[in-house]
Design a protein with these regions (language model features):
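Amphipathic/hydrophobic helical signal segments and adjacent flexible N-terminal regions
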Residues: 2-63, 67, 153-161
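Short, solvent-exposed coil/turn segments
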Residues: 13, 74, 147-150
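Beta-sheet ligand-binding and adhesion/scaffold domains
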Residues: 27-39, 110-161
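N-terminal short leaders/motifs
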Residues: 34-43, 80-95
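Contiguous, well-ordered beta-strand patches that form the walls/edges
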Residues: 59-61, 84-133
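Short acidic, gly/pro-rich beta-turn/loop elements at beta-sheet edges
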Residues: 63-65, 101, 148
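Short, surface-exposed polybasic-and-hydrophobic patches located at secondary-structure transitions
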Residues: 66-78, 84-85
Length: 161
C-alpha cells in the first residue's frame, strides 16, 4: 500500500512539470512576408489612353483586322476610359459592373499591364499587347477570362464635333 501512495504524488509532479514546460516554451522565430516590390512605371501613360474608344474583341488572330474595323464602328456608343482620382484610369475589371481605378504597370521585361495595384502581372490584369496612340490591343492575363472575353481591340474615336 505504501508504494501506491508514492506513485500518485510523483505522477502529479511529472504531469505538472510537462504542462508548465509547454506554457513556457519560447515562440519560434517570427517570419515576415517580404514587402511588395514597388510598381514599375509603364511605357504607356494614363493620359495617353484616357478618352472615347470603339471596342470589339476577337479569339482568333486572323480576325484582328476585321475586329479593328468593327471597333471603329462602335464609336457611336463609345467605351469611355476616364481619369482616376489617384492618377490611374477608370475601367471595369472582368465580370464586374463597377468602374474602378486601375493602374498602368510595367515589368523589367518591358511588358505593360493595366490592373489593380499589386503584383505585376496580377491575375486581374490585362496585358497591353500593342498601342500606337490610335489602336490599343489588350488581352487578359488569366487564361480562363481571356478565353471568355478574347483579345480586346480599342480604336480611338474622333473628337466630338
Amino acid at each position: 500500500m505504501g508504494n501506491r501512495n508514492l506513485k500518485w504524488p510523483a505522477s502529479v509532479a511529472v504531469l505538472s512539470a510537462v504542462a508548465l514546460a509547454a506554457c513556457t516554451t519560447a515562440p519560434g522565430p517570427e517570419t515576415r512576408a517580404a514587402p511588395p516590390q514597388p510598381e514599375m512605371p509603364a511605357k504607356v501613360r494614363p493620359s495617353e489612353i484616357i478618352g472615347r474608344w470603339g471596342y470589339a474583341a476577337y479569339h482568333k488572330p486572323e480576325d484582328r483586322a476585321r475586329t479593328e474595323a468593327n471597333a471603329r464602328g462602335q464609336c457611336k456608343q463609345p467605351f469611355v476610359i476616364g481619369q482616376g482620382p489617384n492618377g490611374g484610369v477608370m475601367m471595369y475589371l472582368a465580370d464586374s459592373n463597377q468602374l474602378q481605378e486601375l493602374r498602368l504597370k510595367g515589368t523589367p521585361g518591358g511588358r505593360d499591364y493595366i490592373g489593380p495595384a499589386g503584383e505585376t502581372p496580377g491575375v486581374q490584369d490585362r496585358e497591353i499587347v500593342s498601342f500606337d496612340g490610335r489602336v490599343l490591343v489588350m488581352k487578359y492575363v488569366d487564361p480562363e477570362v481571356d478565353g471568355r472575353y478574347g483579345t480586346g481591340v480599342f480604336v480611338r474615336c474622333a473628337p466630338r464635333a
